[in-house]
């Protein structure tokens, strides 16, 4: 096998979204990348079922069940452990790669031996609007990720060296409630070892829609973010980053109609960063000035999350 085209294993967790899954898998199998591509579809809490008429040369489709903790994190880990490629990539079942994604990303990762993990820019598609999102720098440090989630480093664009993933970074955390923010938690660990290489091209389409599994799970979001802060205490070294998470917790409480905790968390947020907009949004929602649903929709139209 040529060193320039190592085998890539792509892990696609899925649950009850067959049409979206077929779109994602088609984009993976039709990559222009010249090396072998193994597409591992991991069925979470469902039976493997994805008939495929014919595979392109050098492409392999493997269907497995999640044998670990039910949910996204366990399914992703089941795929990682079953992967045979030198490189491991992630793709959510409702997203799709552009044809040259792997070709360009693998080349950049191989040209940057100090990097173990790479991402690419994204095209966020919500309803009839598409927004381009690129990381602020090509090498994203741990400190930058403490300060900001950087949505541009989307899990559907992750490409990692399998050995470093298993030996240094570790698997996805299956204890985080509802698998919410499991990608951010994993990136925090990855960036401790080396900066994350962010290819400055939008090479994946990220679809935001009402069937997204985290669109309305406010209680889970509160639990997961609290878990994240407890686990990564170095967040306290970056007040603006901690304020962002506190603001998300405040917003979630406000969305649930829990005015007292929403205002309490908003005050904690503003004590760290008076410019954190999520605190003001949480206060506005708690006062009945606007609904959480409206705020979320407007953010998505702009290609942003809460």
PLM feature spans:
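Cell-envelope/extracellular polymer assembly enzymes that use nucleotide-activated donors
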Residues: 6-9, 38, 185
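Short, acidic, metal-binding catalytic loop of nucleotide-sugar glycosyltransferases
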Residues: 26-36
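Acidic helix N-cap motif at the loop->helix transition within catalytic regions
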Residues: 47-55, 96, 100
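Flexible acidic/His/Gly-enriched loops in nucleotide-sugar-dependent glycosyltransferase catalytic domains
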Residues: 58-60, 74, 102-170
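Glycine-rich, basic loop-to-helix element that forms the pyrophosphate-binding segment
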Residues: 66-83
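Short aromatic/hydrophobic "clamp" motif used to bind/position activated sugar donors
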Residues: 88
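Conserved nucleotide-sugar donor-binding catalytic segment
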Residues: 138-219
């Amino acid at each position: 096998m040529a060193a320039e085209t190592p085998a890539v294993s792509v892990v696609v967790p899925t649950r009850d979204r067959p049409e979206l899954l077929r779109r994602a898998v088609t984009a993976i199998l039709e990559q222009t990348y010249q090396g072998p591509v193994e597409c591992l579809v991991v069925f979470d809490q469902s039976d493997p079922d994805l008939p495929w008429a014919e595979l392109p040369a050098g492409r392999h489709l493997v269907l497995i069940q999640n044998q670990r903790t039910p949910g996204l994190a366990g399914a992703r880990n089941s795929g990682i452990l079953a992967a045979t490629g030198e490189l491991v990539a992630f793709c959510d079942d409702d997203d799709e790669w552009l044809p040259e994604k792997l070709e360009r990303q693998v080349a950049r990762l191989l040209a940057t031996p100090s990097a173990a993990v790479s991402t690419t820019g994204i095209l966020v598609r919500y309803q009839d609007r598409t927004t381009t999102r690129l990381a602020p720098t090509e090498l994203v440090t741990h400190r930058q990720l403490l300060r900001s989630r950087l949505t541009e480093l989307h899990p559907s664009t992750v490409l990692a060296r399998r050995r470093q993933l298993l030996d240094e970074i570790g698997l996805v955390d299956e204890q985080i409630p509802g698998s919410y923010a499991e990608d951010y938690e994993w990136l925090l660990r990855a960036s401790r070892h080396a900066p994350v290489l962010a290819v400055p091209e939008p090479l994946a389409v990220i679809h935001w829609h009402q069937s997204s599994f985290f669109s309305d799970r406010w209680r889970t979001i509160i639990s997961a973010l609290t878990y994240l802060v407890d686990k990564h205490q170095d967040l306290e070294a970056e007040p603006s980053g901690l304020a962002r998470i506190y603001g998300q917790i405040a917003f979630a409480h406000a969305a649930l109609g829990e005015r007292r905790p929403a205002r309490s968390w908003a005050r904690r947020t503003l004590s760290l960063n008076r410019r954190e907009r999520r605190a003001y949004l949480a206060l506005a929602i708690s006062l009945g000035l606007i609904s959480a649903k409206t705020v979320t929709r407007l953010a998505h139209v702009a290609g942003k999350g809460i």
